[in-house]
């Protein structure tokens, strides 16, 4: 009986530690997404590139080409007078594993102002923690599909349903 009590206490401790870790992971990926989005709208190209997954960087032609693409996007955002008015996380991140990686699907709800108009955007960022890595990197969610996620990240859980996304004028 004593060993059963000890086992239950140990299991409760492990479950509690996992819940704390999960909460810390959720806070971390949300803060990383906040940093990434702020960096984009503030023109911080280095931070945007640092938070972009290496597979995406490679598909863009390498770091120099990726930097140029981000710089061009920043110019378009500034020319359109686009600003993030608000950024919230409507649901907690979902964590998945596959192909030796950890993934975080981080839902976002933002209000963007542009040339006197406001746009509401429900979207998500796909976070990736590669084996041996300590920092999460991301892929913008509206560009991720069940088909291309397997090309980008073989082993991603094939049955996962990505959250919906939309953009609408307010």
Go through the PLM ranges and name each one.
Residues 4, 15-42:
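Short, low-complexity N-terminal intrinsically disordered segments enriched in polar/charged residues
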Residues 22, 26, 59, 63-66, ...:
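Intrinsic-disorder-associated interaction segments
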Residues 38-42, 71, 75-79, 154, ...:
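Generic surface-pattern signal
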Residues 1-7:
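Sec-dependent signal peptide recognition
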Residues 33, 40, 52, 142-143:
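Hydrophobic alpha-helical core bundles mediating ligand binding, dimerization, or RNAP-core interactions
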Residues 30-31, 46-103:
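Short solvent-exposed beta->alpha transition segments
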Residues 92-170:
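Exposed beta-sheet edge and beta->alpha loop/turn motif
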């Amino acid at each position: 009986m004593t060993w059963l009590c000890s086992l239950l206490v140990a299991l409760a401790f492990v479950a509690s530690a996992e819940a704390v870790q999960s909460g810390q992971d959720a806070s971390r990926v949300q803060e990383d997404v906040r940093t990434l989005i702020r960096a984009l709208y503030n023109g911080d190209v280095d931070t945007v590139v640092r938070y972009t997954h290496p597979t995406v960087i490679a598909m863009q032609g390498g770091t120099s080409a990726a930097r140029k693409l981000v710089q061009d996007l920043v110019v378009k955002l500034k020319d359109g007078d686009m600003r993030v008015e608000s950024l919230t996380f409507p649901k907690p991140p979902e964590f998945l594993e596959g192909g030796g990686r950890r993934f975080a699907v981080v839902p976002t709800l933002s209000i963007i102002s542009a040339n006197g108009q406001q746009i509401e955007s429900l979207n998500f960022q796909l976070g990736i923690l590669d084996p041996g890595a300590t920092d999460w990197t991301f892929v913008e969610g509206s560009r991720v599909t069940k088909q291309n996620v397997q090309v980008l990240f073989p082993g991603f859980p094939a049955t996962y349903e990505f959250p919906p996304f939309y953009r609408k004028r307010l």
